[in-house]
């Protein structure tokens, strides 16, 4: 009789077990709108949302560590930018205003950017990092910074299991957080 065990020295299994984090959908939406769009390969998890939120507010995604997603998608302005043209890294001025990021879970046609050129929230998050005006860096540089950071390796491990940090996992975490940005009680919503 031969038996193998999949536990480590302290008796815990090394199995990846993320904590599901269903969206907190307002009753108004439950009553009047079809369910949100959540990709099967990127389910909402507590760990993924936590990682995505940290990434969203951290300027580590930009070339000179000065520009975060929240720099243009400001929580003080309902995750929008009140400026006519958004300002990127090194003070470079873009040609458009950044899009608002609330209620993204209900973007049924899955088209992003003002011209609709990208077809998922996960893929949308890829472009600002490499845009020369917005964050002006490469994904290889970002992944290296994340791998060498004191917090991110553990956060990625908790969110996605024992796999290497990649640009795809980074954008999945960002998308999970962005799907939690739900508005339903503003003056506009109540009208």
Residue ranges of predicted features:
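Sec-dependent bacterial lipoprotein signal peptides
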Residues: 1-4
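Periplasmic c-type cytochrome electron-transfer domains
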Residues: 6-191
């Amino acid at each position: 009789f031969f038996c193998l065990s999949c536990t480590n020295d302290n008796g815990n299994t090394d199995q990846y077990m993320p904590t599901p984090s269903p969206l907190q959908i307002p009753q108004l939406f439950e009553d009047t709108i079809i369910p949100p769009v959540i990709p099967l390969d990127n389910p909402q998890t507590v760990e993924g949302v936590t990682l995505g939120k940290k990434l969203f507010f951290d300027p580590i995604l930009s070339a000179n560590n000065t520009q975060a997603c929240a720099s243009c998608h400001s929580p003080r302005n309902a995750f929008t930018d009140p400026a006519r043209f958004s300002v990127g890294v090194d003070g470079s001025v873009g040609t458009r205003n950044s899009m608002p990021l609330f209620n993204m879970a209900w973007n049924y046609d899955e088209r992003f950017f003002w011209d609709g050129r990208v077809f998922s929230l996960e893929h949308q998050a890829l472009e600002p990092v490499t845009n020369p005006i917005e964050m002006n860096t490469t994904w290889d540089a970002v992944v290296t910074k994340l791998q060498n950071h004191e917090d991110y390796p553990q956060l990625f491990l908790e969110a996605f299991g024992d796999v290497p940090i990649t640009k795809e996992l980074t954008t999945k975490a960002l998308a999970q957080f962005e799907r939690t940005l739900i508005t339903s009680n503003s003056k506009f919503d109540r009208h």
